[in-house]
Regions:
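Accessory alpha-helical/coil subdomains and C-terminal extensions
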Residues: 1-65
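C-terminal non-catalytic interaction/assembly regions of soluble proteins
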Residues: 56, 61-139
Length: 139
């Protein structure tokens, strides 16, 4: 305020100058789509998104990033990384046993929008799911 930065919390995660990401020489970032899920969702939208073959997908689920069963069936084990996130605005999305079976990553504490940016950056470094998941735990 008034030209002075006020800090109230210190970040415990990697960021800015500690980051492994460098976008200076990139002309474009990978295409990562956000799909917002809701109860009673029909198959048309998730099928359409998967058919576009994005570089990555963020599934914005309910509470703990919970997604409808039909969306899970459509989006599991795709050729691109898929990350579960929550639409609640805060809280953690942690891995559950079904994630490993579906090939999903989790956003940890990141919002869907921040998870999208991190996945875009992560895909400039690797397509390895374990390494991508580690980025979500570090940043």
């Amino acid at each position: 305020q008034d030209g002075v930065a006020h800090y109230y919390k210190a970040s415990t995660r990697r960021h800015t100058k500690e980051s492994v990401f460098d976008v200076h020489d990139l002309k474009e970032l990978p295409r990562v789509v956000i799909l917002t899920c809701y109860g009673g969702m029909d198959d048309m939208v998730p099928m359409s998104v998967v058919a576009t073959n994005p570089d990555g997908l963020i599934l914005t689920g309910l509470g703990h990033g919970t997604i409808p069963q039909n969306v899970r069936q459509i989006t599991q084990n795709t050729a691109f990384p898929t990350v579960r996130a929550s639409r609640t605005g805060s809280g953690m999305v942690s891995a559950v046993p079904q994630d490993a079976l579906a090939g999903y990553l989790v956003s940890d504490t990141l919002s869907p929008q921040k998870a999208r940016i991190l996945l875009m950056l992560g895909l400039t470094k690797t397509k390895n799911l374990k390494k991508l998941q580690q980025f979500f735990y570090e940043y």
